[in-house]
């Protein structure tokens, strides 16, 4: 109608005063459904006992330890790892924010690529594909492994990031540090989706008068 008024095809816009917000309901964004913190130990035990392939089992472990994005994990190459410095360096072209990212590796996390190195058979990929080792692991491999473990609809590879954020917030780690490791921009929808524990903890302190 605005087009018609501007081009003298109509004298007035009869719906000009109607706000679409009062007619069309805005869909509320919902956070992902994922395994709760209390269930995390069982999930990790299930990962340890996974028998669907050693590369996949180790990929799940490394994702749990580092909580990087699935693409950042499966496309990793050996040149990105600094074993002496206990870290991996993800180049900007592989990052969603197009900035280089350093992933510190704990003793447990560092043990995983050491195991994978023995299974690499000379591949440049840390996680080579099952069929063609010239390619990296499929981005569905981790998801389907979680399905086979009984976590369909409750856990994806991406959800390890949310679980990690919740656990670290509950343990009192600084929010800014967690966001930095997750490579989030402050105050965006993604940050809000992952941050379950921070406001609960703050609310509890407020209720206690702290």
Feature-to-residue mapping (PLM):
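Non-catalytic DNA-binding core/recognition domains of DNA-processing enzymes
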Residues: 1-4, 18, 105
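Short conserved catalytic/interaction loops centered on acidic-Pro-aromatic/His motifs
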Residues: 5-13, 176, 180, 188
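Basic, Lys/Arg- and aromatic-enriched nucleic-acid-binding interface segment
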Residues: 6, 10-76, 84, 95-99, ...
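Conserved beta-strand positions that form and line the central face of beta-propeller blades
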Residues: 17, 89, 126, 159, ...
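Residue-level detector of conserved, well-ordered beta-strand and adjacent loop positions
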Residues: 19, 91, 106, 128, ...
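Catalytic-site neighborhood detector that most strongly recognizes the C-terminal catalytic loop/helix
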Residues: 26, 34, 89-98, 110, ...
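Short, basic (Lys/Arg/His-rich) helix/loop patches that form interaction surfaces
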Residues: 45-57, 66, 103, 111, ...
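Residue-level signal for tight coil/turn positions that link beta-strands
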Residues: 84-85, 107
């Amino acid at each position: 109608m605005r087009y018609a008024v501007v081009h003298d095809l109509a004298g007035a816009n009869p719906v000009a005063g109607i706000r679409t917000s009062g007619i069309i309901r805005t869909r509320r964004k919902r956070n992902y459904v994922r395994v709760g913190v209390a269930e995390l130990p069982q999930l990790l035990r299930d990962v340890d006992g996974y028998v669907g392939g050693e590369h996949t089992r180790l990929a799940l472990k490394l994702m749990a330890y580092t909580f990087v994005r699935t693409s950042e994990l499966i496309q990793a190459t050996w040149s990105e790892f600094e074993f002496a410095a206990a870290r991996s360096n993800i180049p900007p072209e592989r990052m969603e924010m197009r900035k280089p990212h350093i992933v510190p590796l704990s003793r447990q996390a560092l043990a995983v690529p050491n195991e994978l190195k023995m299974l690499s058979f000379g591949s440049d990929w840390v996680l080579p594909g099952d069929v063609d080792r010239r390619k990296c692991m499929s981005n569905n491999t981790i998801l389907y492994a979680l399905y086979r473990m009984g976590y369909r609809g409750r856990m994806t590879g991406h959800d390890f990031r949310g679980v990690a954020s919740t656990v670290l917030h509950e343990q009192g780690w600084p929010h800014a540090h967690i966001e930095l490791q997750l490579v989030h921009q402050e105050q965006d929808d993604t940050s809000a989706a992952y941050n379950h524990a921070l406001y609960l903890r703050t609310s509890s302190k407020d209720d206690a008068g702290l």
